[in-house]
Amino acid sequence: MELLAKTRKLNALLQSAAGKPVNFREMSDTMCEVIEANVFVVSRRGKLLGYAIHQQIENERMKQMLAERQFPEEYTQSLFNITETSSNLDVNSAYTAFPVENRELFGQGLTTIVPIVGGGERLGTLVLARLGQEFLDDDLILAEYSSTVVGMEILREKAEEIEEEARSKAVVQMAISSLSYSELEAIEHIFEELNGTEGLLVASKIADRVGITRSVIVNALRKLESAGVIESRSLGMKGTYIKVLNDKFLQELAKLKTN
C-alpha cells in the first residue's frame, strides 16, 4: 500500500467520525494496519487509551499490562525525556516496547516513540513496535500524522470535560441559590447527617433536632431533585433514601459552610 493510500485510510476514519469522538481503539487498529506494527496510544499518566497488535508478544507481563490497560509508571515517565520522534530503538534501549526480560527472543525488536503534543503541552505518547523491519520515512510520516490526530482528539475530550464540569457547577449553584435560608440550613444538616453521597435518613428526626418543620425539608429536597442534583425516594417508616447525582454538589455545599 502506497503512502497516499495509507494516508487516505487514516483520513477515512476521521471523516466517518463526522464530528463524533474518534475511537482510540479504531484509530489504533487503522494505524496498525497501515504501519504494520504494534501500536500503543499512551496517556500522560500511562493509561492505554488504545492499542492494536500486529505481532503477538508472548509474555505474561505484557499480557497483564494490556489487560489492565496501564503502562508501568517508570516507563511512562521516561517517555517524557523524548521530545521528538525517535525511531528504530533496539531492545537494549530504555524505551523499548519489548519485554526486557526476554531480550534474547526479541533481538530484532525495534521501537519508535512519537510524542503526542497539543496546545503547547505534552498529552501522551504514541509507541510503535515491530520485529525485523526498520521503520522507514513513510512509516514515520504516518506515525507523526496519527499522533497529531490523536493529540487533537485528546484536546477535544479535555475541552468537553471542562465544559461539562462548568455546566455541572452552574446547575448546582442555581439549585442552591433557589433555596430559602431555612431550606439551605435544612440541606446542610441533612448532608451532615448523611456523611456521604447516599444513604437513608428520617426527615422528622432532623426537623425536630434542628427546630424546623418537616415541610421545609421536603421542599428543599424537591428543589434539588427537580434540578437533577439529587435523587430521593420515600421508603415509608424507614425514612427517605437520598443519593447525590451531581458530584459538584457536596463541594459547593462545603464552600458555603467555610464562607
UniProtKB/Swiss-Prot annotation:
Q: Which residue numbers delimit the DNA-binding region? A: 203-222
Residue numbers of Phosphoserine PTMs: 215
Q: Which residues form a coiled coil?
A: none
Consequence of substituting residue 183 to A: Cannot form tetramers
Q: Which domain of life is it from?
A: Bacteria
- GAF domain: annotated segments: 1-155
Q: Name one GO cellular component term.
A: cytoplasm
Keywords, sorted A to Z: Cytoplasm, DNA-binding, GTP-binding, Nucleotide-binding, Phosphoprotein, Repressor, Transcription, Transcription regulation
Any one Gene Ontology molecular-function term assigned to this protein's record: DNA binding
- Please report a single Pfam family linked to this protein: CodY
So what does this one do?
DNA-binding global transcriptional regulator which is involved in the adaptive response to starvation and acts by directly or indirectly controlling the expression of numerous genes in response to nutrient availability. During rapid exponential growth, CodY is highly active and represses genes whose products allow adaptation to nutrient depletion.
Entry's family note: Belongs to the CodY family.
Kindly give the NCBIfam families that the UniProt entry links to this protein: codY_Gpos, PRK04158.1
- Subunit organization: Homodimer. Homotetramer. May form homodimers under conditions in which energy sources are sufficient (active state) and homotetramers under insufficient nutrient conditions (inactive state).
Q: What is this protein called?
A: Global transcriptional regulator CodY
Which classification does the entry list for the species?
Answer: Bacteria, Bacillati, Bacillota, Bacilli, Bacillales
